[in-house]
């Protein structure tokens, strides 16, 4: 579920909620400063970068690079997403272990945390099929909403789609993607592996955005959420803003 509202000052606020058939909710929301926050299992909110860090991007640099749209300034330095920069300014954690402990303290207030107990709680919360179940319909909806076909359709590519193994250009930059182009990409197999599908688009204002998609090749019986789902969900929200 994705939603948008206008606050009393006229700011656009965005939200996203992943509600499994069984297990912890993941809620994203933005504020007037365009800081992105996450609520896990309907608890108090955290900067969304805490979740990203807990998933394995444990340095500020790796998080900035993850969402970087590839653009540079006149000196050739990366121009990072200001929304991620502002969110990192609210994030007091500096490593994956610290992020896991911070999440643990929100979910289990009053209980003394250790890195091991925090990691076990996090893994059990999302990646244990006995505790988390999207159901087949939930996996279908995530694959459709966050998969590369849905995200690419109707967009104008800012960079070419390239087969990294052969160097072959599958689609050129500047192409507006329709069903025919989607079929060309699908036939090429460039997004048929594990992990993310990533590409870059140019919107109607000429702004370049990086699109991060989940692994939509997962079968419908894969009912736990994945780290690719979580990152793709944040990417989707950023591209609504």
Residue ranges, per PLM feature:
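N-terminal non-catalytic structural scaffold regions of very large proteins
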Residues: 1-241
């Amino acid at each position: 579920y994705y939603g948008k509202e206008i606050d009393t000052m006229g700011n656009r606020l965005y939200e996203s909620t992943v509600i499994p058939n069984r297990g912890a909710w993941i809620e994203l929301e933005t504020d007037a400063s365009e800081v992105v926050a996450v609520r896990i299992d309907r608890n108090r909110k955290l900067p969304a970068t805490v979740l990203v860090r807990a998933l394995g991007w444990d340095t500020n640099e790796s998080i900035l690079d993850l969402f970087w749209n590839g653009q540079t300034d006149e000196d050739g330095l990366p121009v990072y997403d200001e929304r991620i920069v502002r969110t990192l300014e609210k994030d007091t954690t500096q490593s994956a272990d610290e992020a896991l402990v911070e999440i643990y303290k929100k979910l289990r207030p009053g209980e003394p945390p250790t890195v091991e107990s925090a990691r076990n709680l996090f893994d059990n919360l999302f990646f244990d099929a006995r505790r988390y179940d999207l159901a087949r319909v939930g996996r279908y909806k995530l694959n459709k909403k966050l998969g590369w076909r849905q995200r690419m359709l109707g967009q104008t590519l800012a960079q070419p789609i390239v087969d990294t193994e052969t160097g072959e250009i599958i689609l050129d930059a500047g192409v507006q993607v329709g069903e025919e182009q989607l079929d060309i990409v699908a036939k090429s197999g460039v997004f048929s592996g594990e992990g993310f599908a990533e590409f870059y688009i140019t919107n109607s204002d000429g702004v370049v955005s990086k699109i991060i998609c989940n692994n939509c090749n997962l079968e419908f019986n894969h009912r736990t959420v994945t780290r690719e789902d979580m990152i793709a969900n944040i990417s989707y929200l950023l591209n609504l803003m």
